[in-house]
Amino acid sequence: MSSDVRVHTWPCSYYLDLEKQWLPGKLTLTPRSLKFSVDKAEEVLVGLPLSSITEIRKETSLFIFSAITVLEKGQAKHWFSSLRPSRNVVFNIIEHFWRELLLSQPGTAANPTSPMTRGQELMGLMASSQRRMEDTAKVLHHQGEQLDSVMRGLEKMESDLDVADRLLTELETPSWWPFSAKFWKTPVEAKPRDSVSVAPCEPFGKEGVVIRVPAVVSQRTESHSKPGKLTVLVSGLEIHDSSSLLLHRFEKEDVDDIKVHSPYEVSIRQRFIGKPDVAYRLISAKMPEVIPILEVQFSKKIELLEDALVLRSRGRASPAEGGCSIRHAASRLMGCTTHQELPTGGQEGQQSQLQKDWPLLSEGEAQELTQILSKLKGLALDTEAELERQDAALDGITVAVDRATLTVDKHNRRMRKLL
């Protein structure tokens, strides 16, 4: 995700120590920096990398006006006041992204200039693919559980229809018929059914948790935002506060729409008739990991707004690029350009020479990549098997529904004759 993506912008004032005055402008937060620009000039006056910030505090200027102070490395202190909608809202969001950046890069403070090796970048790419595959597999298995539940419901319905058939037969039998009671004692003959054996699916985790991320939560208005957590379950969504107290649970079928305002901000709404809607707005540094999962679970209810279209543009690729994206990514990580080609003569010798000149992966990185690829292969095979099982289950459900519909129509005609 690009570090230039704007997370949020707030009107505020910045204290310029050289001129001893407050300058009105806008405070802009990106995933990796904090910037202040003056209103009139519209130029960035102050730019602070989040990794260089050592402390963020709530203070007051002249003992009256609320402000936020940012302490930078080298003991430089920056004052921001007149924050809207409120100081607490701005503080919670900035502190959230600052903490998440520090937690995600534990070695940055110790050695900020050390670049990632090609092997580390490639492992990060493969690990991200593995997480996406695991999340998709969880959602797919939950879908399989729902199909199993539908199949069990249809089997129970057919059993009830068999009982209704015996009752109707009893009612249709003349009162003088001496063997009318035998219908209650004669075992029902097994009917040939094209049912599909359905293997039970084990739930993932105690509550089927797909992903849980820290977030800044606000309900209805931004002025009441506070730290919390967003939990994506296979059956819905849960929002907790910082004390792990449940604020609201959205069942999967109760969610009416999800709007993605930016790669880091989403809003979730449940509509009601005759009372206010339930709506929550969430901002999180980990939201780019959550949005693809929401797109899978709520594909017909999610909407990407203008500032979030960068997610869709990143996901688009030409067919040629999509077919060999891993190879192109590996080539890029190896430092090769897409236009470099080896001549036909002596190709094997030049390849061996390139391997000697460019040490790509260490032995440990190669072993870890092998393990990740093995896991990806296993996940892909499991996903394929689950999809085939669900296709067969859908065929069985279709047959069972058609059979139940015909039986219900037949019973309705028999009941009308009795009336």
From Swiss-Prot:
Residues 109-171, 356-418 form the t-SNARE coiled-coil homology domain. It is found in: Endomembrane system; Cytoplasm, Perinuclear region. GO terms for biological process: exocytic insertion of neurotransmitter receptor to postsynaptic membrane; exocytosis; long-term synaptic potentiation; synaptic vesicle fusion to presynaptic active zone membrane; synaptic vesicle priming; vesicle-mediated transport in synapse. GO terms for molecular function: SNAP receptor activity; syntaxin binding. One of its GO terms (cellular component) is SNARE complex. Gene3D superfamilies: 1.20.5.110, Pleckstrin-homology domain (PH domain)/Phosphotyrosine-binding domain (PTB). Keywords: Coiled coil, Cytoplasm, Membrane, Repeat. Its main location: membrane. May play a role in intracellular membrane fusion. Belongs to the SVAP1 family. PANTHER family: SYNAPTOSOMAL ASSOCIATED PROTEIN, SYNAPTOSOMAL-ASSOCIATED PROTEIN 47. Associates with the BLOC-1 complex. Interacts with BLOC1S6. Forms a complex containing SNAP47, VAMP2 and STX1A. This is Synaptosomal-associated protein 47. It comes from Rattus norvegicus (Rat). The gene is Snap47.
